[in-house]
Regions:
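Catalytic core of Fe(II)/2-oxoglutarate
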Residues: 121, 132-140, 150-270
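Active-site rim elements
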Residues: 27, 72, 77-85, 129, ...
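A structural signal for the main folded, soluble domain(s) of proteins
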Residues: 57-72, 97-105, 111, 116, ...
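Non-heme Fe(II) oxygenase catalytic core, chiefly the N-lobe of the double-stranded beta-helix
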Residues: 43-46, 74, 83-140, 149
């Protein structure tokens, strides 16, 4: 496959590698974009301070020091061009062929995707993603992450790590280096996370995330929908038994409060 702004991808070879991948089907493509375009996108990323003004800031036990911008009207021109490329019919059809997932669809709203920037000290705990978007009625099937981090040595962390279904053993890890695309089929066993980021304060981990959906449910789906589900790594015992349950309780309590407020508002309108 060869599309404008994108380096050639051997679809057949990548499909075979995905089928043989440990843990769950995944892939890694270096030199994903044409170099000039990759540099253009790299230079277009906002600073962390700028991103905070327009995006959603995460500061929780599970996800910390991360900003996410999903509104494409706020994308700089080069990043908007990347969004359009990854949502194009030609690219989406090629991803269906490569992954073996028929009838993939892009998400124009980029729910949970778009520009991701994580500051030094940030992290993302191991999780499986929400499996269904109630706003569109579509099933989430594929994640693709494109990284834009130059001069990123191993000690900076921020690796994408992939885990077995019990979250006992890491089955693969990818450095978030410049112009690398990593992707995987999302499922009930596609446990993944981002290792702690330890880069200098003047740097940040930058990526662009896109997620793809189908109208049809995946084979073997049990009919249950869920939001993001987190698990502690084997080395994070206290987080798993104390911090995560405490935060889950706080979220559940807040959800109940919000629901009660909505009920009161409806009653007052009658």
């Amino acid at each position: 496959m060869k599309l404008p702004l994108l380096n050639e991808i051997d679809i057949g070879s990548m499909r075979a590698k995905m089928a043989d991948a440990p843990a769950f089907p995944h892939f890694c493509i270096d030199n994903f974009l044409e170099e000039a375009f990759a540099n253009e996108v790299h230079d277009a990323f906002p600073s962390y301070a700028e991103a905070e003004k327009t995006g959603r800031v995460f500061s929780t036990v599970n996800e910390k020091r991360k900003v996410q911008i999903t509104d494409s009207s706020k994308f700089p021109p080069a990043i908007l061009k990347l969004h359009e490329l990854l949502a194009s019919e030609e690219f989406v059809n090629a991803m269906s062929e490569m992954t073996g997932i028929p009838n993939l669809m892009a998400d124009p709203a980029l729910a949970g995707g778009g520009i991701h920037e994580t500051n030094s000290g940030g992290h993302l705990d191991v999780h499986i993603d929400f499996n269904y978007n109630p706003n569109t009625g579509l099933h989430r099937r594929l994640n693709i992450l494109v990284y834009f981090n130059k001069d990123w040595p191993e000690e900076y962390g921020g690796y994408l790590d992939l885990w077995d279904k019990e979250v006992k053993e890491c089955q693969g890890r990818f450095a978030p280096v410049f112009n690398r695309a990593a992707g995987f089929a999302t499922s009930e066993v596609s446990w993944h996370g981002v290792t702690p980021i330890t880069c200098p304060p003047d740097k940040m981990r930058r990526s662009f995330a896109v997620y793809y959906y189908t109208k049809e449910a995946p084979a073997g789906w049990n009919g249950k929908t869920h939001s993001t589900v987190f698990k502690a790594r084997p080395t994070e015992y206290w987080k798993g038994v104390v911090a995560m349950p405490a935060e889950n309780l706080m979220r559940a309590t807040q959800k109940s409060i919000d629901s009660a407020k909505q009920s009161v508002k409806k009653l007052l309108k009658k």
